[in-house]
Amino acid sequence: MPRIPNVIEGAYLQDILEQPDAMRRTTQSLAGAPFLSADLLSLCTKNAVERIVLTGMGSSFHALHPLHIRLTLAGHFCTMVETSEALHYLPDLFSKNTLTVAVSQSGESAEIVRLLCDGYLKGPIVGITNTPNSTLARLSNLTILTEAGPESTVTCKTYLAGLQALHWLGAIFLNEKLTLTAQHLEDAASEVERYLGQWMAHTASLQNELEGIEQIFITGRGYSLATAGTGGLIMKESTRSPAEGLSSAAFRHGPMEMLSSRVLACICLGDSKTASLNQRLYEEAHKARAKALLIGSGSDHPACTLPDCPAPLLPILEILPVQMLSLALAARLGFEAGNFALASKITATE
């Protein structure tokens, strides 16, 4: 058996390993803001809010999927749109009776800054960011700060902290018991810590799955669309290699024809509503002689086996095997994962 290359350790790996602490800090911060619920209710009542627009770019956009589902199922008129598309093609979304929820880890993304500074907003805005003095934090009517701490390159701990903040916001909208919400977030942090305790074994086992692979797909449905979108993004960003994140349904409408021994399909099992559909896609990928990994509680691969959790929190756990895969692929290619050559941490240009 050929020698398995060692992961070249750097800032990205350190940020990944810091995720449990970042999550715990964020949970404590959210639970320590007793007036947040009242402030949100006041903001919605004062502005006679009739519609909610969820917006962001990159992983901040993908992280909105669980909240979009939860709010829509609860009867809220809710739209999810990339900020750039909204600015150029759907500016009328931001009417005076619309509450905008904008997510940006830096709070300085070009599109978010334009949204705030160029007169698009007619109604109130809730900003979720990791940066206290950012444009988003300063100009939002209500700001929810995550406590991920500084992050060097590829999004990881800020993404998980953002998912937590969005889950908390959803719990407020749905009038759920926040003590229980806090406990679920604490439990998720413990599971992340337990998983990352085996990071070296996980990356080593995933390197074996990458032999001869030229293309990676990451798929999911429902809440797991957050994982598919962010997973494809961070694989490209951290390894400079072709990877695509899309829904499992969209994968059947064309990309499935690409299945071969040179393709790795990472399929999120997801929640009970569509788990059987994702399981069937996984089995069909194997029959097509592609390499396939099932991410979830029913996986037969140790690095992809995850515990059960509330469905809206699945993306917090599902992204961990993708992070390990990015470390494994970069190691095979002989460079440090997440070491930017062309990109920068903050996308300041549209």
Predicted regions located by residue number:
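Glycine-rich phosphate-binding loops that contact phosphosugars or nucleotide phosphates
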Residues: L43-S190, R221, L264, C268-P312, ...
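Active-site phosphate/pyrophosphate-binding segments
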Residues: A11-V53, L142-L145, G149-L264, G334-E350
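Short, charged low-complexity linear motifs
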Residues: M1-I4, E237
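Composition- and surface-driven signal marking solvent-exposed, interaction-prone regions
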Residues: G231, N278-L281, E318, A341
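A cross-family phosphate/adenosyl-ligand binding-site feature
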Residues: R3-A22, V126, P150-Y159, L306-I319
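Residues at alpha-helix termini
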Residues: L73, E237, K287, A331-R332
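Peripheral docking tails and interdomain loops at the edges
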Residues: T305-E350
